[in-house]
Amino acid sequence: MEGFLGFNHNHCFIVLFFVSLSLAQYEHWPYLPGYPEPPPQVYQPPRRPADVPKIQLRLAGQKRKHNEGRVEVFYNGEWGTVCDDDFSIHAAHVICRELGYVEAVSWLPSSKYGKGEGKIWMDNVHCNGKEATLAACTSNGWGVTDCKHTEDVGVVCSEKRIPGFKFDNSLLNQIENMNIQVEDIRIRPILATYRKRVPVTEGYVEVKDEGTWKQICDKHWTMKNSRVVCGMFGFPSERKYNTKVYKMFASRRKQHYWAYSMDCTGNEAHISSCKLGNHLNVDTEKNATCDNGMPAVASCVPGRAFAPSSHSGFRKAFRQEQPLVRLKGGANTGEGRVEVLKNGEWGTVCDDNWNLVSASVVCRELGFGSAKEAITGARLGQGMGPIHLNEIDCTGFEKSLTDCKFNMESQGCNHEEDAAVRCNVPAMGFQNQLRLVGGRNPYEGRVEVLAERNGTLRWGTVCSQGWSTVEAMVVCRQLGLGFASHAFQETWYWHGDVSADSVVMSGVKCSGTEMSLAHCRHDGADVSCPRGGGRFGAGVSCSETAPDLVLNAELVEQTAYLEDRPMFMLQCAQEENCLASSAVNTSVTSGYRRLLRFSSQIHNNGQSDFRPKNGRHAWVWHDCHRHYHSMEVFTHYDLLNLNGTKVAEGHKASFCLEDTECEADVQKQYECANFGEQGITVGCWDVYRHDIDCQWIDITDVPPGDYLFQVVINPNYEVAESDYSNNVMKCRSRYDGQRIWMYNSVHNGANQDGDTEERFSAYWKLGNSILFSR
């Protein structure tokens, strides 16, 4: 790690780079704190016609992002809504620009953000998209409508704010609880110890207003305000700070204060949901003053994954000792499908009433900040098993999602409604240490890292020896580009910078959960790469989506049985190496093999289709199955003793991938017959029945006893998936020489129940595993 972040004081450009890493929170700024700011951009809004009344807008309701919500209009002293009749994206653009956003992304009819109250001010709204205000668009007239609040319209605005946007405060004295509208917000480190720390956790809270950064007076500042600000920057909680030190700093220079204070309740995910507080006094130079006060300071507590340690540094994504909540299927740190542990079994959360407040409880529980987005509709993949929680209602101050009010019944919910979150995470500056070069688009290219060599920081390649999809996943995550779709060990077709051809990183081995490639195991300064860099440098291609294969563990348990099969019926299987090595000594005419048979059903619960690694030209024809196999290693079936040693061999070696069955609204795309395209569609599953050739483990040589039965899907990570942790299924098995019992199946990482052995007596008399002979 040190080799990638070091610098030499003799090189000023290296010092600047180190500062930029230290102040990673400001990586998107055009300048660094302490340096002269560029002249503020002044936004010139379109002029409002004199005959058009002044209005104020806000986004309200059950938000899932801070920049979306039900459109509400303040007119004639009262808040009201807008009907969705004749509404268009042009009207949405006008609304978003009036609120300070660059443009609208979409609009939603039929009270998608909940029903409003009071007046419906506008109906049959028609805009051309260039109006200065929504009030300048045509409509039926103020309050003239035949709509109900079930038709309240909502909009989704771009996250980009208009540079230099000026907040119109002309109606401020008429409106109570007006929401905050600012261009941007930051925590600017003041003390030297925080200026050199990653992430930045303490400093002045500043807002960008009319293109200029301004401090906030602390006279009405509360810890609730700090909690909201800390949450926005990826921190789960706030803490007290040394006010005396900051007073000393504040007295040394003149401050430029924002004209308002903030009034947050503490459960907001973004300051745009907070209310404007008191209006400050304004001096003769048009600068707000903070009598006997100083700039407000926020001091934040980072989650464990982001708190630097002298021993481990920043390591893997945050994991609790005994987590009750986890995120699955997300591409980046701090995002994924929400799953909760109940009665020893992981289950999902239904998205009914899912909003930013509840999502923020999940994020803070896992050591992140507030929620950036409350995701609905299984957009980060569908889970399997039970749906544990529904209609969650959090106050925002709960320590865990399980402390919130919720409905235990999941009637009417299915996995197409699985809730997910995207959390605010601290800016660590990791993306500044890595780049992709030479690709056809920003999502692919040769991997180049910034490393210190001989006291100089320079770009270089990564040795491709042993480079796999797992390492590529870390690269894509570090750059914020989603999942890896491919890992490349040759990149001659991507021409990078010749000066960066030298290998600066070798021996890279990742677990897949790291936030940065530098956190993976590697050779450090002792680089060794016989192949060299250049054309053999490691490369990746990234994708915003990925498949996710999950085995139906219950079906394996239910269908397992033993069969004594004559050798003369196994000649084809022996040719495909589906039997144990001792089978060569078994008589073809009188011998038999004892087979543990079962069915497997492999679901694709991800966001994109699972396609084989090899193209059609590399598929292999199998006479026994009468079709082509696209993957030689797709699934491993193993019988292990209790210490994990493999005791049985001989199982299905290669596979054809197809859509055997699909959910009701999903159409099959892949089939093995007639040299068809192979793969598994999202929402479909591939079934390997217990009665097909090689769908077994040869246990002829296995003595009676207790064992572990294991199925591993995509064992070599040849194809990228959004979640590899659910690719392994294990279950306990007991074999008495004539019968076998399968029980207590779990996916990798899940906890087995403590009373398994006590319950085993109930399984002992089950008859679905009795020996069959042919």
Swiss-Prot record:
| Cystine pairs | 83-147, 96-157, 127-137, 217-290, 230-300, 264-274, 350-413, 363-423, 394-404, 463-529, 476-542, 510-520, 572-624, 578-694, 656-672, 662-684
Q: Modified after translation how? A: The lysine tyrosylquinone cross-link (LTQ) is generated by condensation of the epsilon-amino group of a lysine with a topaquinone produced by oxidation of tyrosine.
Provide the GO biological process annotations: collagen fibril organization; endothelial cell migration; endothelial cell proliferation; epithelial to mesenchymal transition; heterochromatin organization; negative regulation of DNA-templated transcription; negative regulation of stem cell population maintenance; negative regulation of transcription by RNA polymerase II
**Main localization of the protein described in the UniProt heading:** secreted
Q: Which residues bind Ca(2+)?
A: 548-549, 721, 723, 726-727
| Cofactor(s) in the UniProt record | Cu cation; lysine tyrosylquinone residue
Which of UniProt's keywords are assigned here? Answer: Basement membrane, Calcium, Chromatin regulator, Chromosome, Copper, Disulfide bond, Endoplasmic reticulum, Extracellular matrix, Glycoprotein, LTQ, Metal-binding, Nucleus, Oxidoreductase, Repeat, Repressor, Secreted, Signal, TPQ, Transcription, Transcription regulation
Question: Where in this protein does the record say 2',4',5'-topaquinone is found?
Answer: 688
Q: How is the cofactor bound?
A: Contains 1 lysine tyrosylquinone.
Task performed by this protein: Mediates the post-translational oxidative deamination of lysine residues on target proteins leading to the formation of deaminated lysine (allysine). Acts as a transcription corepressor and specifically mediates deamination of trimethylated 'Lys-4' of histone H3 (H3K4me3), a specific tag for epigenetic transcriptional activation. Shows no activity against histone H3 when it is trimethylated on 'Lys-9' (H3K9me3) or 'Lys-27' (H3K27me3) or when 'Lys-4' is monomethylated (H3K4me1) or dimethylated (H3K4me2).
Would you tell me the protein name for this molecule? Lysyl oxidase homolog 2
Give the source species. Answer: Gallus gallus (Chicken)
Gene from which the chain derives: LOXL2
